[in-house]
Amino acid sequence: MLIGCASLTIQLGKRTILKDISMGVEPGEIVTIIGPNGSGKTTLLRAMIGAVAPRSGRLIRAPGLTLGYAPQTLHIDETLPMTVQRFMSLPKLGTASDIDAALSQAGVPGLEKQQIMSLSGGQLQRVLLARALLGRPRLLLLDEATQGLDPRGVADFYRQITSVRDELGCAIIMVSHELHLVMRKTDRVICLNGHICCEGEPDIVSRSPEYLALFGIDNDDEAAIALHSHGRGRSHHGSLSRAG
């Protein structure tokens, strides 16, 4: 296991955001966390990178684990000129060759001299991915990495994520609202709503009562289930897990 939680509970002020979260991620997995707004998805990722302290429970990391993180939003002063290369060098200096390699892995080679504020939404998301790839992390954390993209852009981004996993051998944890693509492009789904409602392989989770209570189902969901590839499924995730 690369990273995991054991009975993790997080409070912000008097409000409990996450309660009794227990989960783990194995090398090479793509795990997608889904849930309604305010369900604690971003908070869980922030806990994994050490930005939020749990009230109780434990966060477990493999020794020497390296992380790459792409946040949900990017705040840059529009009046401040900044090239992609400069952005990717902060807060520590990345070499030109490392930056070039990361941009290529993210599917946007040759953007080093472009101004950050001139990028399209799709290009910016790829640059955030490239920045997270610097240092070749063993675990990649992506928070709503496809927000603002059109359906084709979302599909292209998911293909790139799979390519990154295959090339680097890293595990990937994604927060996403793209339910249809999640069911095709991930190994395991964790359905979160302040606690883990259910988790498992996408086709199993999508039929669970807990998932249906949150999201319902339509023909597009059924088509997505049919298109899901089982090639990278693991036997110990072959059944549905529910919160006790």
Swiss-Prot record:
Q: Which GO terms describe its molecular function?
A: ABC-type zinc transporter activity; ATP binding; ATP hydrolysis activity
The answer to whether UniProt assigns keyword Cell division to this entry is: no
Checking Gene3D superfamilies in the record gives: P-loop containing nucleotide triphosphate hydrolases
Key words, A-Z: ATP-binding, Cell inner membrane, Cell membrane, Ion transport, Membrane, Nucleotide-binding, Translocase, Transport, Zinc, Zinc transport
Q: Which SMART domains match?
A: AAA
> Where mainly located?
membrane
What top-tier enzyme class does this entry carry? translocase
All copies of domain ABC transporter, residue ranges: 3-218
Q: List the disulfide bonds.
A: none
What's any GO biological process attached to this entry? response to zinc ion
Reaction(s) catalyzed by this protein? Zn(2+)(out) + ATP(in) + H2O(in) = Zn(2+)(in) + ADP(in) + phosphate(in) + H(+)(in)
Might you report a single GO cellular component term?
plasma membrane
- What is this enzyme's EC? 7.2.2.20
- What does the record say about its membrane topology? Peripheral membrane protein
Residues engaged in binding ATP:
35-42
Top-level taxonomic group: Bacteria
Q: Which Pfam families match?
A: ABC_tran (PF00005)
> What's this chain's function?
Part of the ABC transporter complex ZnuABC involved in zinc import. Responsible for energy coupling to the transport system.
Task: Kindly state the subunit structure of this protein.
Answer: The complex is composed of two ATP-binding proteins (ZnuC), two transmembrane proteins (ZnuB) and a solute-binding protein (ZnuA).
Record's PANTHER family?
A: METAL TRANSPORT SYSTEM ATP-BINDING PROTEIN TM_0124-RELATED, ZINC IMPORT ATP-BINDING PROTEIN ZNUC
Name the family the entry cites: Belongs to the ABC transporter superfamily. Zinc importer (TC 3.A.1.15.5) family.
Q: What is this protein called?
A: Zinc import ATP-binding protein ZnuC 2
